[in-house]
Amino acid sequence: MAKITIKVGSNLLVQQDGQLDKRYIVELCREIGNLMSEGHQVVLVSSGARAAGYGYLNKSNAQEADLYMKQALCAVGQVQLMKLYESAMSFYGIKVAQILLTREDFSHRKRFLNLRNTLIGLTEMGILPIVNENDSVATEEIMFGDNDVLASMFAIGWNADYLLLMTSVDGVIDQNGKVIPFYREDTTNMAIAKNASSRWGSGGITSKIRAARAAAAAGIQTSICNGKKLENIAQFVLTGQTGTVFERVGPIKAKKAWIGFLSKPKGSIFINEGAKIAIENNRSLLPVGVVHIEGDFQAGDVVEIRLDDGTFLGKGIINFSSAEAKKIVGLKSDQLEDVLGYSCSKVLIHIDNLWKRDN
């Protein structure tokens, strides 16, 4: 049994006239039904609400509408989209559930854990969770930006085995028009052809690559592949190969995956070279290695860890508020209680609560 996250974008779900492609949705649900009948657990991350709203109300000029109008039409379209999924999955005796999220649902660990428990309950009951960004309430500060990022974060939070980011081309295409079968971090200078966002979608290939890299770094076998060829889904689960594959790294523990990929940092800790070497050797971050503090945060918040030149090194859960941390910058651990005036932790960020960029 495998845990599979599938993301389909608006460019696959919507026809040129702006109407939902009902035939495609039925065929997609057939592939998902086959996987679930084999005992696999599946989560579908589906775009298309805004396009469905425009189509249902016979509106046009998708990119020209004001934000409030787009959000209103997303609310209308989400209902139509779920009706289609519910109807199509009923042919396989499978019920569906709707999950609408914003970035904040992942940034707060308690909410994230509640979300994960809900997801576990749904999949254990044989229900297909259908996930989308809550476009009707999302603002710029709490938006994912596109569903590629949402799918990646969801797969990481669920500890999925596979993530398929399905698009309208065969994978990541180089400038010669050929598919790159395997994407590796040592080939970051490879020539990748640019592709624009679709009329109805918000993400291009750059977004998909960023999302795929994050999932692979968390131990998830990931592919960017052609969603028009729905047989790619079963092929990837069976062979681990289709489209452009991002080989899994890790896995890492769930808590560190949340810190590294799902949390939203509240500030930044700038450290010296000695502290950098210490955390590279799996040692906790001490105040003596800190040179500068930025941001307003409380004890228990997630902060970025950067070298004093600004180089990003990782993230961690800090044991002090920003006000406290600024008082103990550069101090040795045995000086902390004298400066603060009360008993406190000797470490700024414990290694168990620290995610390194190279994890």
From Swiss-Prot:
Its EC number is 2.7.2.11. GO terms for cellular component: cytosol. Substrate binds at residues 47, 135, 147. Pathway: Amino-acid biosynthesis; L-proline biosynthesis; L-glutamate 5-semialdehyde from L-glutamate: step 1/2. It catalyses: L-glutamate + ATP = L-glutamyl 5-phosphate + ADP. It is found in: Cytoplasm. GO terms for biological process: L-proline biosynthetic process. The keyword Protein transport does not apply. SUPFAM superfamilies: Carbamate kinase-like, PUA domain-like. InterPro entries: AceGlu_kinase-like_sf, Asp/Glu/Uridylate_kinase, G5K_ProB, Glu/AcGlu_kinase, Glu_5kinase, Glu_5kinase/COase_Synthase, Glutamate_5-kinase_CS, PUA. Catalyzes the transfer of a phosphate group to glutamate to form L-glutamate 5-phosphate. Belongs to the glutamate 5-kinase family. PANTHER family: GLUTAMATE 5-KINASE, ISOPENTENYL PHOSPHATE KINASE. This is Glutamate 5-kinase. It comes from Kosmotoga olearia (strain ATCC BAA-1733 / DSM 21960 / TBF 19.5.1). The gene is proB.
